[in-house]
Design a protein with these regions (language model features):
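Extreme N-terminal starter segment of soluble prokaryotic enzymes
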Residues: 1-5
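Extended catalytic core of nucleotide-activated donor transferases of GT-like folds
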Residues: 7, 14-126, 142-147
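Nucleotide-sugar donor-binding catalytic core of glycosyltransferases
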Residues: 8-17, 129-198
Length: 198
């Protein structure tokens, strides 16, 4: 597929990811259409002159564009991606357990892309009928394209954590608020989830 659709205008980080991938795809020769979810009807109107049947694909994040938005559905509830035979490559950056309601009604030519091997294992176990892959490990933006950054071996810290992390103490008051049996029950759930994440 030489023509690719990306979304912006909804969640800032996912718009940023889309623009970064779109830029890289343009550098290797793809045509790109940036669909602005904050202006859906105007974007849809501009999309159709760009669209080429059999040569256009959607690359999106976390089910944007396939989560029931009315401007992507026809009068029968058919998704635009199905009506136009557009394959969709959905990069899911959160655990798929949050998206069961979307996974049960994906477009026909849907490809689920995981960023975590355990998410991928979860998909194989609970949604084997869905095309899973290719795996896409996390990446980043080059802050120093001129390579002026400090090499890893000379850095003060050798690990960087990017994401949402809350120390257990944040939740401790909720876990231990009733009695020992209640506390043991919740710690047991945490231990089980850590031992069996999928």
């Amino acid at each position: 597929m030489k023509k690719l659709i990306f979304f912006v205008g909804d969640i800032e980080t996912q718009g940023y990811f889309s623009l970064q991938i779109a830029e890289a795809m343009q550098e290797i020769g793809h045509e790109v259409f940036i669909y602005d979810l904050s202006k859906p009807w105007g974007s849809t109107e501009k999309f159709f002159p760009f669209f080429e049947r059999g040569n256009t694909a959607l690359i999106n994040f976390n089910f944007h564009g396939m989560s029931g938005e009315e401007y992507f559905l026809d009068e029968n509830g058919t998704m635009m991606w199905d009506a136009l035979s557009i394959p969709s490559y959905n990069i899911v950056v959160d655990h798929p357990m949050y998206y069961h309601h979307f996974l049960e009604k994906v477009p026909r030519n849907y490809h689920h892309i995981s960023i975590d091997r355990k998410h991928e294992a979860y998909m194989r176990r609970f949604f084997p009928e869905i095309i899973n892959g290719p795996f896409l490990p996390l990446a980043g933006t080059k802050l120093y394209p001129d390579r002026s950054n400090v090499p890893v071996e000379f850095r003060k810290y050798d690990v960087t954590m990017v994401g949402n992390y809350c120390v257990l103490a944040t939740f401790e008051k909720y876990i231990t608020r009733i009695d020992d049996e209640y506390t043991a029950f919740y710690y047991g759930m945490i231990d089980d989830l850590l031992a069996n994440p999928w």
